[in-house]
Every structure is written in structure tokens, then in C-alpha cells.
Swiss-Prot record:
Belongs to the adhesin P1 family. It holds the Pfam family Adhesin_P1_C. Residues 175-198 have a biased composition (Polar residues). Residues 47-76, 93-116, 128-214, 457-476 are annotated as: Disordered. Residues 128-142 have a biased composition (Basic and acidic residues). This is Putative adhesin P1-like protein MPN_370. Residues 151-162 have a biased composition (Gly residues). Residues 59-76, 461-474 have a biased composition (Low complexity). Signal peptide: none annotated. Transmembrane segments: none annotated.
Length: 737
């Protein structure tokens, strides 16, 4: 019997994600509660160091629109903008065809990614510097001006774009005891004084003031947006800014030089690395765009080389090289770690290791926010290109299914999206217009895979007709099915084997027997007599309870009566669902008697089983008693036909005209559902002419109390029971009081 039960209720097909946490509901809340918030040495919360609202300057840090409205003079708990997003820090590594090795060679046509074994979530605040007078922070004292390269724009001759790691000025950090002194490492070109370590204001596009409530409540369990913000942090955590520690290709990007704080470096602050500039509640930092997506604004075109690494998924254009480059979204998910990205409506799901993470209302975020739609943030800059996912990324989704291993798989088709992009670009060009077929057809695939390509993999060739064609073999132009990982396969097979009913059922049975050993029977000869006695007691209790309930149960009306449970007679049972239920209950009652006999006789007649079966039988007989009483009451009524000029009677309590009070509402006859608007329902009405009641607007009520108005209820008072079948036909029956 146990084998049969296990075979019925346990499916041998398991989901891949049963190996990890179930992130649904409260479990996700628990996970978020323990996310290690790192930033400026403070937890992310009310103890975060903010600014004084009263004394904050109009362009002070933490506000782009002026001072806060708080007039209490207390310290504000608004986070600095870089504390809003979620980032991470790890050693920078290169990707070699899906396997990861530290990037130390001279010829490196790969793009830096992160070491998945050394990942830590952070709030992106590592480079956000408090005022130097605070002398409390020891994290990455790089000025905002240096970090963004803002001092090198506008005709600068340094040769580097804003945010280029080569162009960053290193902060000079001095530590005396527990006090830190930070200052810019190089003087400004037009001044002999060094730049201040703090910045005066934040760029407007980096200060999502309107999103501060969500940001502040990110760790609040009652915030409905916390899961959405968490996913934005995961997908929007841009890879760490590469610390280009050397002067040539032979010693750049060394993992040993990827340092993150003064604590790590102690004395050698020249190698201080900046954690990823991070995203601001989903917003990309333009300095990061310039650094990782090539010299987009400074040079007007993207380039991906070891000296100017580009990490992104740019829309391929036919007038430049090295365009199709995959975005590695902070978490360096290897093919076996992430896959099966599924989009349905506005929900997004993806596999992360053994987890299936699902979030809603994420596919179509606000313009400029990270998500499936990545666009340039600086709308005023004509050279700021859109980053793929294209305009409507959800249009590329073709569906998903569950394979034999229980994994969710999905199909994407970007051909149409890419052709639209190529067609638009071709029409804007001065050369012959391309048809859009020049781009290769992109095969359907299941997930994204971080891969590698040389910058020359994408080439453009001009045909004799002058039409430009794409000759591209770059794997970045395709969505690649994840590689099969042997360990994962073995894990799936092991779980499947473990949960096979033929193996699971005997194990459970054995464990059950070992857990509950049988009690010895000192006198087996008397055991049947003891069981028979208990059977008699059980049956007697059940019968007494059922009979008493049947005799005392009044007629039970619902408001409105439920789909044929009451009304009309069919033998001794109500018509419709009620009759079926009564018959089912009678069968169940018989089965209960049989089961209690078997249970008591063969299972040692435990006290727990005795109580359980007694309660079950009593409950079953109670329900049967209700229906029997209802049927008996209806049979006493005298049925006849009446005119169709009634008012609707809506009950607010149990109805029995002879025993209990009732209330009906005067309603216009025309409002009754005579045309099948409510098929299968019952309507109990009262004759409109018997008591001289005028059909009202539905706001009047008349209450009948049998203890006071019995005499007023004459034989002329007629109650009508109307039923509407599925075809809209009306069956009317009446009875007099």
C-alpha cells in the first residue's frame, strides 16, 4: 500500500532547481535579509551615514534637486547614490571559451570577467567618499572627478576618454593612527592646489531622488519592490573596473593587482582599484559606459582591445570593427551556472546554479534602467548608441517548455530584431540600402554563454554592387546553448534515481517500521474482543451524533442558494449538486465503517486512530443530517404556480419560514436574471401581490420575525423558488407559508 501511495503522489521527474533554495515568498525574504551589505563601513539602513538636512548645500551629496524637506535638523538617512545599487567585488579574470583563467598573457583577445569563487555582494559604495573631515572611511578614496574622468573632458589632450582607467588619477591616502587623510594625487592643470577628495554635487542622471523610498526600503520585508531591486542589482552589477596595473599588455589585468580597499593595500595605495562604478537603482554610470563599452562618447565608435576593453553587447554596425560583444553582468555566470532565461509577460526567470529565480514587473522597466532593455543614458549625446537588447527585447521570446529532466528551456529568435536594426542603419546611410538580410540568421538558442572572440572576428566586406555585407563568425552574435556539465548531469541523475518510487517507497516503509516499532501484545487471545468492543463504542457514538444532528438541523439556505443544492425534489434528496453530494456522503459513510473495522482489527486499535475515526464518522453523519433535514422541510411545503410579478428575496441568515427569522429586499422584477445571466442559480422570491408590497428600487427591506408576526403571515402569502438552468430557462415553483 505504501508503494502504491508513493507511486501516486511522487513524480519521478524532478526539476533541476530542486537542488537549491526555493526563492519563492518568504524564503526570498530570508535570503535578502542576509545579503552582506558592504559600503563605507556601514550597514545599509538607518545607521548609514548621511548628510545634515538643515546644513546640506543646495547641490550637496545625496540630493540633486536641493535640500531635503526635513526641517527637524536631524541627520538624514538617505543613502548616497552609490549605496542604492548592488554590486560585487572579485578578482578580475579572463574568459577562455567558457573556462576561466587569470588574464596575464600578452596576447589577450578576451574580455575580463569575474572569478565566481571570489564574489561578494556590495552596495557600490566602495568608491563613494565622505568628506575628508569625517576621517572615518578607509574604502577607495578616489574622487568623483577622477573616477568619472570629468576633469579630462572638453578639449582635453590627455588622449583618454572619461572613465578610462589609464586616465584616472590616483588618490593620495595617508593614515595616522585611526585617522585617514585623503587628497587628489595630482594637482589640477590650472591650479597648484590639489582637488578636494569629496565632490560637491552628483550628476542629475546619477541621482534617482524619486527612487529613494524604494532604495531605503530595499531591506524592508514589506517593500513589494525589494525582489525587483535585488534582480536589478544582480543583472545590473557591472563588472569591476579593471585595474590596469601595468604599462603594457604583458602585465595588465593581473589578478594579484586587483585590490579593493586601503585595508588590502596598506601602504601601496598606487595600486588601489575601484570596484565597479555600479548602477544607481538600475541606472548605469556613464563613466562605466565609457570604460566598458569602448570610447563611445569620446571617440564616437566602440573598440575592444586590451588597452581599451569593451564589455557589452553592442549592436553590430557595418562601418566599424569588433561590435558584437557580450555584456557580462557582474556575476560571472559560467554556462553551467546560469541559463534558461524565460520571459513571460512582464515576468523574468532565470536559472542560477540550482536556483530558479523569478521576478515580476521587470521586463519593461523605466526608460534608462537596466533590465532587458539597455539604452544609453545621455539622451543629448548623439553618439551614445543603444546597447542591445534592442528596442523590444521581449519580442524575441518564442516560448519555453520543460524537458525530460524538468528543466525550463526557452527559445529566442533575434533575427527579426537584428534585421530591424540593420535596416534602420542602412536607410540612414548614404550608401546603397541594405535589405536587412545581410546579417546572418541567428539560430534559436536556450541561454547566454560568456565566450571569447578576437576583435577582428567581426568584419565588413563591400560587394561589387557597393552593398555592405556582414561576414561575421563571432559567437557573440548568437545565443549559445550552455555546455553540458558532467557534475550537474550526475547530480540530476542521482536525484532522479533517489526519488524513483521503486527505491523511495521501500526506504520510507523501512524507516517507518524502524521509527514506530510494534507494541508487544501480552495476551493475543483477548485482542479481538477488545477491538470489537471499541468498534461497537465507535459506531454508537457516530450514530448518536448523526441522529441528534439530523433531528435538530434546520433548513440551510445560502445567499444566493448554491447551484442547485436546494430546490426541487429528487427522491429523498435535493436536485442538482446537493443530491450528488448526499449520495457521495452515504458512500463515504459506508467506507468509513469498513475502514474503521480494518484499522482497529489489524493495526492494534490505537487510541489516536479511534479518536480520528470517531470524529470522521460523526462529521460525515452530521453533513448527511443537514441534507436530510433540508429535504424533509421542503417536502412539507405546498407547491403551486404563481404569477411572475415577484420581488427578489435575498437572505441574510438561515431561512425556515416556520422556525427562523428572514429578511428580503424589495427589488424591481426587471432586475431578476431571466435570460440566463446567472445560469444554474436559484432565486427565492415572494409574491408581490399577497401583502401589497410595491416593487421598490432595491433599497427597502422587510424583515419577518416568527415570534412576533406569525399572525400576519396568511395563506395568501406565497413564496416562489425560481431556478435558472444553463440554457437560461426559468423553472418556477411556489409554496405557501
Amino acid at each position: 500500500m505504501l508503494k502504491l501511495a508513493v507511486g501516486i503522489f511522487i513524480s519521478p521527474t524532478l526539476t533541476r532547481f530542486s537542488t537549491g533554495f526555493n526563492l519563492a515568498g518568504s524564503v526570498l525574504d530570508q535570503v535578502l535579509d542576509y545579503v552582506p551589505w558592504i559600503g563605507n563601513g556601514h550597514r545599509y539602513g538607518n545607521n548609514h551615514r548621511g548628510v545634515d538636512d538643515i546644513t546640506a548645500p543646495k547641490t550637496g551629496a545625496g540630493s540633486s534637486s536641493g535640500t531635503s524637506t526635513n526641517t527637524s535638523g536631524s541627520r538624514s538617512f538617505l543613502p548616497t547614490f552609490s549605496n542604492v545599487g548592488v554590486g560585487l567585488k572579485a578578482n578580475v579574470q579572463g574568459t577562455l571559451g567558457g573556462s576561466q583563467t587569470t588574464t596575464t598573457g600578452k596576447d589577450i583577445p578576451k574580455w575580463p570577467t569575474l572569478d565566481p569563487a571570489n564574489l561578494q555582494l556590495w552596495t557600490g559604495a566602495g568608491w563613494r567618499n565622505d568628506k575628508a573631515s569625517n576621517k572615518q572611511s578607509d574604502e577607495n578614496h578616489t574622487t568623483f572627478k577622477s573616477a568619472t574622468g570629468s576633469g579630462q573632458q572638453g578639449g582635453s589632450t590627455t588622449g583618454g576618454s572619461a572613465g578610462n582607467p589609464d586616465s584616472l588619477k590616483q588618490d593620495k591616502i595617508s593614515k595616522s593612527g585611526q585617522n585617514l587623510t585623503t587628497q587628489d594625487g595630482a594637482p589640477q592643470s590650472n591650479s597648484t592646489t590639489e582637488s578636494a577628495s569629496n565632490y560637491d554635487h552628483l550628476p542629475p542622471n546619477l541621482t534617482p531622488t524619486s527612487d529613494w523610498p524604494n532604495a531605503l526600503s530595499f531591506t524592508n520585508k514589506n517593500n513589494a519592490q525589494r525582489a525587483q531591486l535585488f534582480l536589478r542589482g544582480l543583472l545590473g552589477s557591472i563588472p569591476v573596473l579593471v585595474n590596469r596595473s601595468g604599462s603594457d599588455d604583458s602585465n595588465k589585468f593581473q589578478a594579484t593587482d586587483q585590490k579593493w580597499s586601503y585595508t588590502d593595500l596598506k601602504s601601496d595605495q598606487t595600486k588601489l582599484n575601484l570596484p565597479a562604478y555600479g548602477e544607481v537603482n538600475g541606472l548605469l554610470n556613464p563613466a562605466l559606459v565609457e570604460t566598458y563599452f569602448g570610447t563611445t562618447r569620446a571617440g564616437g565608435s566602440g573598440s575592444n582591445t586590451t588597452s581599451s576593453p569593451g564589455i557589452g553587447f553592442k549592436i553590430p554596425e557595418q562601418n566599424n570593427d569588433s561590435k558584437a560583444v557580450l555584456i557580462t553582468p557582474g556575476l560571472a555566470w559560467t554556462p553551467q551556472d546560469v541559463g534558461n532565461l524565460v520571459v513571460s509577460g512582464t515576468s523574468l526567470s532565470f536559472q542560477l546554479g540550482g536556483w530558479l529565480v523569478t521576478f515580476t514587473d521587470f521586463v519593461k522597466p523605466r526608460a534608462g534602467y537596466l533590465g532587458l532593455q539597455l539604452t544609453g543614458l545621455d539622451a543629448s549625446d548623439a553618439t551614445q548608441r543603444a546597447l542591445i537588447w534592442a528596442k523590444r527585447p521581449w519580442a524575441a521570446f518564442r516560448g519555453s517548455w520543460v524537458n525530460r529532466l524538468g528543466r525550463v528551456e526557452s527559445v529566442w529568435d533575434l533575427k527579426g530584431v537584428w534585421q530591424d536594426q540593420a535596416q534602420a542603419a542602412a536607410q540612414a546611410a548614404t550608401t546603397a540600402a541594405a535589405t536587412g538580410d545581410a546579417l546572418p540568421e541567428h539560430p534559436n538558442a536556450l541561454a547566454y554563454q560568456i565566450s571569447s572572440t578576437d576583435k577582428d572576428s567581426y568584419k565588413a566586406s563591400t560587394q561589387s554592387s557597393g552593398q555592405t555585407n556582414s561576414q561575421n563568425t563571432s559567437p557573440y552574435l548568437h545565443l549559445i546553448k550552455p555546455k553540458k556539465v558532467e557534475n550537474t548531469t550526475q547530480l540530476d541523475q542521482g536525484l532522479k534515481t533517489c526519488w524513483t518510487p521503486t527505491r523511495f517507497a521501500p526506504s520510507c516503509a523501512k524507516a517507518l517500521v524502524q521509527t514506530i516499532p510494534p507494541k508487544p501484545n501480552p495476551n493475543p487471545s483477548k485482542q479481538p474482543h477488545r477491538c470489537l468492543g471499541r468498534i461497537v463504542v465507535t459506531l454508537a457514538v457516530c450514530l448518536v451524533v448523526g441522529v441528534l444532528e439530523e433531528q435538530t438541523a434546520p433548513i440551510r439556505w445560502t445567499s444566493p442558494p448554491l447551484n442547485g443544492w436546494v430546490g426541487g425534489l429528487w427522491g429523498n434528496y435535493p436536485v442538482g449538486v446537493g443530491g450528488i453530494v448526499v449520495r457521495i456522503l452515504k458512500v463515504c459513510k459506508t467506507l468509513l465503517f469498513i475502514s474503521i473495522f480494518i484499522s482497529i482489527f489489524f493495526l492494534n486499535c490505537s487510541l489516536t486512530l479511534f479518536i480520528w475515526t470517531t470524529a470522521s464518522l460523526a462529521t460525515g453523519l452530521t453533513v448527511v443530517g443537514h441534507f436530510t433535514s433540508t429535504t424533509t422541510t421542503l417536502k412539507r411545503q405546498q407547491f403551486s404556480y404563481t404569477r411572475p410579478d415577484e420581488v427578489a428575496l435575498r437572505h441574510t441568515n438561515a431561512i425556515n419560514p416556520r422556525l427562523t427569522p428572514w429578511t428580503y429586499r424589495n427589488t424591481s422584477f426587471s432586475s431578476l436574471p431571466l435570460t440566463g445571466e446567472n445560469p444554474g442559480a436559484w432565486a427565492l422570491v415572494r409574491d408581490n401581490t399577497a401583502k401589497g408590497i410595491t416593487a421598490g428600487s432595491g433599497s427597502q427591506q422587510t424583515t419577518y420575525d416568527p415570534t412576533r408576526t406569525e399572525a400576519a403571515l396568511t395563506t395568501a402569502t406565497t413564496f416562489v423558488l425560481r431556478r435558472y438552468d444553463l440554457a437560461g430557462r426559468c423553472t418556477t415553483s411556489t409554496f405557501r407559508s
